[in-house]
Structure formats: C-alpha cells, structure tokens
Amino acid sequence: MSRTIFCTFLQRDAEGQDFQLYPGDLGKRIYNEISKEAWAQWQTKQTMLINEKKLSMMNVDDRKLLEQEMIKFLFEGKDVHIEGYTPPSH
C-alpha cells in the first residue's frame, strides 16, 4: 500500500518511499519528506557524480561528498554541478 507525503523537493503531495532508504536521522527525514519521484531524480544525479568524479563507495571521503551533494540537491534546491557536463538540448 502506498503512502502519500508532502514532498519538500517537488513542493507537492506525492507517493512516499516504501521504507527508509538511508540510515540515521537523515534517512528518517528522506523517508518523511522525499517522494519516490524526487528520489529517482537524485539517483540519476548520484550516478552521474559517481561516474564523472570516479567516486568509490569504499572511500569515506567520497561517501561524505555524495551525502553533502544529496542534502544540497534534495533539501536546499541546489542542482548538482558536474564539471564538463552539458545537458542535451532539445
């Protein structure tokens, strides 16, 4: 059964996560405030960051960087900047 939350990223009601995806207090905040749609947008940005910056999830500093970028993207409205990336034009 899906649950509806007010997504702080999308600024509207949307389908919430089925379970807490991230540990700790930040994970609780994501579960309560970030929709599946917004999380999917973050996952796309996260994948780009990992690939373009050659991050390793085994490296503590890389994980911290990724967490900081996630907070900026999901809660502060700041887009992820990837040096050298140009979005496709339509």
Curated annotation (Swiss-Prot):
Gene Ontology terms, MF aspect: iron ion binding
- Name the keywords, alphabetized: Iron
UniProt-listed Pfam families? Iron_traffic
| Cystine pairs | none
Q: Which GO terms describe its biological process?
A: cellular response to oxidative stress
Q: Which Gene3D superfamilies match?
A: Fe(II) trafficking protein YggX
UniProt keyword Cytoplasm present: no
Q: How does it assemble?
A: Monomer.
The UniProt family comment states: Belongs to the Fe(2+)-trafficking protein family.
Function, in words: Could be a mediator in iron transactions between iron acquisition and iron-requiring processes, such as synthesis and/or repair of Fe-S clusters in biosynthetic enzymes.
Protein name in the entry: Probable Fe(2+)-trafficking protein
Per the UniProt entry, what species is this protein from, by scientific name? Pectobacterium carotovorum subsp. carotovorum (strain PC1)
Please name the taxonomic classification of the source. Bacteria, Pseudomonadati, Pseudomonadota, Gammaproteobacteria, Enterobacterales
